Swiss-Prot record:
Keywords: Cell membrane, Cytoplasm, Endosome, Membrane, Phosphoprotein, Ubl conjugation pathway
Function: May act as a substrate-specific adapter of an E3 ubiquitin-protein ligase complex (CUL3-RBX1-BTB) which mediates the ubiquitination and subsequent proteasomal degradation of target proteins. Coregulates with PID the auxin-mediated plant organogenesis. Regulates basipetal PIN proteins (e.g. PIN1) polarization to establish inward auxin transport from the L1 surface of incipient organ primordia; this process is essential for the progression of flower organs development. Recruited to the plasma membrane by PINs (e.g. PIN1 and PIN2) and, in concert with AGC kinases-mediated (e.g.
Location of the protein in the cell: Late endosome; Cell membrane; Cytoplasm, Cytosol
PANTHER family: OS12G0117600 PROTEIN
Tissue spec. comment: Accumulates in organ primordia such as cotyledons, leaves and floral organs. Expressed mainly in the apical regions of embryos including cotyledon tips and the apical meristem. Induced by the transcription factor ARF5/MP at the periphery of inflorescence meristems. Highly expressed in primary root tips and radicles.
SUPFAM superfamilies linked: POZ domain
Source organism of the structure: Arabidopsis thaliana
Pfam families (alphabetical): BTB, NPH3
Protein name from the UniProt record: Phototropic-responsive NPH3 family protein NPY1
Domain comment in the entry: The BTB/POZ domain mediates the interaction with some component of ubiquitin ligase complexes.
Length: 571
């Protein structure tokens, strides 16, 4: 740190308690100056020789026949005044980055200019600022920090602007030419925090592009904003480095606990809004902030009541990176925001596809598939969803994003488990989102035994499961959503469902009279399966017998026998 010593006389200021100071001299004090709570007993001559303002104040006091002067608005307070007073006495004072702003403002207040005395305090401070402070990286940062408490004096004297110019100019230099010291000791961890560089993998003298981040992130948010704005507007700094600085600033200053966030909502609101304002403009091809970081900002913006425009900007940015999100990151209290994010993503994805001369979403698009899996996992984990929000969010995902419906099935099953009060029509609405033909064998087996699913869905699951098991050519045709044969198989599934439902209604008292007959069946799915394919094994073994005897046996008798066999299978 640079410093400057002024004066040559020994310091003879002494204190009488906490609030009284005086200059030891052979002459008695002839003026008393009250600066805030502290009283100074001093001498007029050294003060008047350096300060135009003191000349006026002493003159006004003498007209009122008093030797006391009260100063209530001294910038820098009594400490800055004391340094100025000692300079007037010629005593040794030391100026450095920590006190020079206050002393410069106090000297301006006291009008310690060249017309009062040649080589006065203001002149000497300006020389030190230009030749020492503004040439030093860390001193410029420190001075900029001190200017905040001395506004508007520091702003009017252009100390703030000159500090910002000094800091930003050094940020923009070629890292290879840096000779000054800087702070680089990143040990913060977490998905939204800058990971410490592997120093052992770097060459000894290589300086990273983001060497300046830690020092600048010590600034208060308003000064930080002004520095980053100048750096951005220059167009000479990589946007990735700027985004990294913003992430580090959030990690440095934003509280982790919800209680701290809400208790200091005003300051945290300013922080979030400023960071969002400074985020580099992105597109999907060139995005500089992780989705996890953006979603964290979105969650905080909700908690602290950030402006709606801030949320809109975050929604837009998150939608560009949604394929990188985790389910944990996406668990936002306001489901409507998630809906907007997904809707924006799908709209952007469609535009991209159209720009690439695709008329529809392309099956196999990795980004689209990732988002499809993400939304299904979100639907399964968010227990606060209503039926309408569940359905609406699920319907935002196009078919091409769900080649397999296992994730959607899991989400539907979880929702039914969490909401046992669902009516039949509501369950039907939920299950209408799912295509049972797109379930894997494992999910299909689970669904066939799932007591929460409507009967119609279980029948469809069993039907298409049997098709796959038989390796029927129809099964491969059913996988295509545009095949006319598929419609036939759907109709068959529907007919099987109606068949089971009609049989269930007609069963009525017969099943009641059969007593423990139901215990003979291992499961609900087994009973339904045998309804659809009654006597499957027997029919296979006796097909020739049935074929040869069909012309000899009366139709009514054959029907009765089949009916009895079916009745026993399900009772």
């Amino acid at each position: 740190m640079k410093f400057m010593k002024l004066g040559s006389k020994p310091d003879t200021f002494e204190s009488d308690g906490k609030f009284v100071k005086y200059a030891v001299s052979d002459l008695d004090s002839d003026v008393t100056i009250h600066v805030g709570e502290v009283t100074f007993h001093l001498h007029k001559f050294p003060l008047l020789s350096k300060s135009n303002r003191m000349q006026r104040l002493v003159f006004e006091a003498s007209e009122e026949k008093t030797d006391e002067i009260t100063i209530l608005d001294m910038p820098g307070g009594y400490k800055a005044f004391e340094i100025c007073a000692k300079f007037c006495y010629g005593m040794t004072v030391t100026l450095n980055a920590y006190n020079i702003t206050a002393v410069r403002c106090a000297a301006e207040y006291l009008e310690m200019t060249e017309d009062a005395d040649r080589g006065n305090l203001i002149y000497k401070i300006e020389v030190f600022l230009n030749s020492g402070i503004f040439r030093s990286w860390k001193d410029s940062i420190i001075v900029l920090q001190t200017t905040r408490s001395l506004l508007p004096w520091s702003e009017d004297l252009k100390l703030v602007g000159r500090c910002i110019d000094s800091v930003s100019a050094k940020i923009l230099v070629n890292p290879e030419t840096i000779t000054w010291s800087y702070t680089f000791n990143r040990k913060l961890s977490g998905p939204d925090k800058i990971v410490e560089y592997h120093r052992e993998k770097r060459e000894e003298n290589v300086i990273p592009k983001d060497w300046w981040v830690e020092d600048v992130c010590e600034l208060e948010i308003d000064m930080f904003k002004r520095v980053i704005s100048v750096v951005k507007s220059s167009g000479r700094m990589n946007n990735g480095v700027i985004a990294e600085a913003l992430r580090y600033y959030v990690a440095r200053w934003l509280p982790e606990s919800m209680e701290s966030l809400t208790s200091e909502a005003s300051s945290n609101k300013d922080l979030v809004e400023t960071v969002v304002f400074l985020l580099p403009k992105v597109n999907r091809a060139m995005s500089y902030s992780s989705c996890s970081f953006l979603l964290k900002l979105l969650k905080v913006s909700i908690l602290v009541g950030a402006d709606e425009t801030v949320r809109e900007d975050l929604v837009e940015n998150v939608s560009l990176k949604l394929h990188e999100a985790s389910v944990k990151d996406l668990l936002i209290h306001e489901v409507e925001l998630v809906h907007r994010i997904v809707d924006q993503f799908m709209a952007d994805e469609k535009r991209v596809s159209e720009d690439d001369r695709y008329k529809e979403f392309v099956l196999g698009n990795g980004i689209l598939l990732s988002v499809g899996r993400l939304i299904d996992a979100y639907l399964a984990l968010n227990s606060e969803l209503t039926l309408s929000s569940f359905v609406e969010l699920s319907e935002l995902v196009p078919e091409s994003a769900r080649p397999i419906h296992d994730g959607l099935y899991k989400a539907i099953d979880t929702f039914m488990k969490e909401h046992p009060e669902l009516t039949k029509s509501e369950k039907k609405r939920l299950c209408g989102l799912m295509d049972v033909r797109k379930l894997t064998n494992e999910a299909s087996t689970h669904a066939a035994q799932n007591e929460r699913l409507p009967l119609r869905v279980v029948v469809q699951v069993l039907y298409f499961e049997q098709l796959r098991a038989n390796h029927s050519p129809v099964a491969s045709v059913a996988a295509s959503s545009h095949s006319p044969v598929e419609k036939t198989e759907e109709n068959k599934g529907e007919e099987a469902t109606k068949k089971v439902e009609l049989s269930k209604k007609s069963r009525g008292s017969k099943s009641t009279r059969s007593g423990g007959g139901a215990q003979l069946m291992p499961s609900r799915s087994r009973r339904i399966f045998e309804k659809i394919w009654p006597g499957k094994g027997e029919i296979s073994n006796k097909s020739s017998e049935v074929s040869s005897g069909s012309s000899q046996s009366p139709p009514a008798k054959s029907s009765s026998s089949s009916s009895r066999r079916r009745r026993h299978s399900i009772s």
